[in-house]
Design a protein with these regions (language model features):
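Active-site nucleophile and cofactor-binding loops and adjacent substrate-binding regions
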Residues: 31-36, 238
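Short, surface-exposed connector motifs at secondary-structure boundaries
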Residues: 24-28, 257-259
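Active-site-proximal alpha-helical scaffold in enzymes
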Residues: 38-50
Length: 295
């Protein structure tokens, strides 16, 4: 029952080694890009400073990036995107634990900040759903990605044709993986920076009861403008947004601001030092207060 029950979940093998890392007095920090990574830090920050009870932690990712000269050019690894989007998405609920749904389930329109606007988002398998419930008290944890109807259609077609498979097939005298062929036919996302325009947004939407006892809904987010990241770092927005977070984490570990033993996710560590240092890098985060449902 792949669309109801989980199998081996993301992180299971890593967390199985946690005791060995603890006994060795060493820290294994997992999931420290932007999503997972910064999104988990946002969840920690919301739980520590903004909410007394959390109903849902929902990571929401969207963008308005375009690539000049291409009808279809993903701005992130198509190999990884196929893996994430066609695997059964995982959801966590306090009363059920972890469970799965069909790909692209529960579509919703989420309005992103900085002028990106409304984007259709769907459930996608992602590490935050496996990490956040381990350290943050919530009723529900989800991850939804703003893929858009065209991208979803392409992924569904690849799946129908078997081109998402990693099992080698014979082509003439060669043995090749269909997914590797798809990746080879598309441009390397890291080389698209000078052809890209627009913004990408990673963030964590949190609902529940605020520290004042009133219903509260917020979206903590990080937006990167491709023009800025190219001008400042010579790197396209999606790549830069992913890469800056492990740099921040390494600095915090080196300074002792982040410390621990065992296998830990970012939400197991204090959020404020991370958010402060990220801002010092000239790429601040933001928080939008939103009107709670039914208010």
């Amino acid at each position: 029952e792949p669309y109801r029950k989980t199998g081996v979940k993301l992180g299971d093998e890593q967390f199985a080694l946690a005791e060995r890392w603890e006994q060795a007095g060493k820290l294994a920090l997992v999931g420290i890009g932007v999503e997972p990574g910064l999104s988990d830090v946002f969840a920690r920050h919301a739980a520590d400073t903004m909410f007394s009870e959390i109903n849902e932690v929902g990571v929401r990712d969207g963008a308005n990036l375009t690539v000049a000269g291409y009808d279809f050019a993903p701005t992130f690894s198509i190999w990884t995107t196929i893996e994430e989007c066609l695997n059964p998405p995982v959801i966590w609920e306090k009363d059920r634990g972890w469970f799965t749904t069909p790909p692209f389930s529960e579509p919703e329109t989420f309005t992103f900040p900085a002028g990106i606007g409304p984007v259709e988002c769907v459930n996608v398998e992602h590490e935050e759903v496996l990490l956040i419930p381990r350290w943050v008290e919530a009723q529900r944890v989800t991850f939804k990605y703003g893929l858009g109807s065209e991208f979803i259609g392409v992924l569904q077609t690849l799946h129908k044709l078997g081109l998402d498979s990693t099992d080698p097939v014979r082509v003439g005298g060669a043995s090749v993986s269909p997914r590797d062929v798809v990746a080879a036919c598309l441009p390397d996302p890291a080389t698209l920076g000078d052809k890209m325009s627009g913004l990408t947004c990673a963030g964590t939407w949190v609902t529940g009861t605020g520290t004042d006892g009133a219903p509260r809904e917020v979206y903590l987010y990080h937006v990167v403008d491709n023009a800025w990241s190219m001008a400042e770092y010579g790197s396209q927005a999606v790549v830069w947004q992913t890469a800056v977070n492990p740099v921040v984490a390494l600095e915090l570990i080196d300074s002792g601001a982040w410390a621990g033993t065992g296998v830990l996710g970012p939400e197991a560590l204090p959020a404020q030092p991370f958010l402060d240092l990220l801002t010092e890098y000239g790429s601040p985060w933001g928080c939008e207060e939103r009107t709670p449902a039914g208010k």
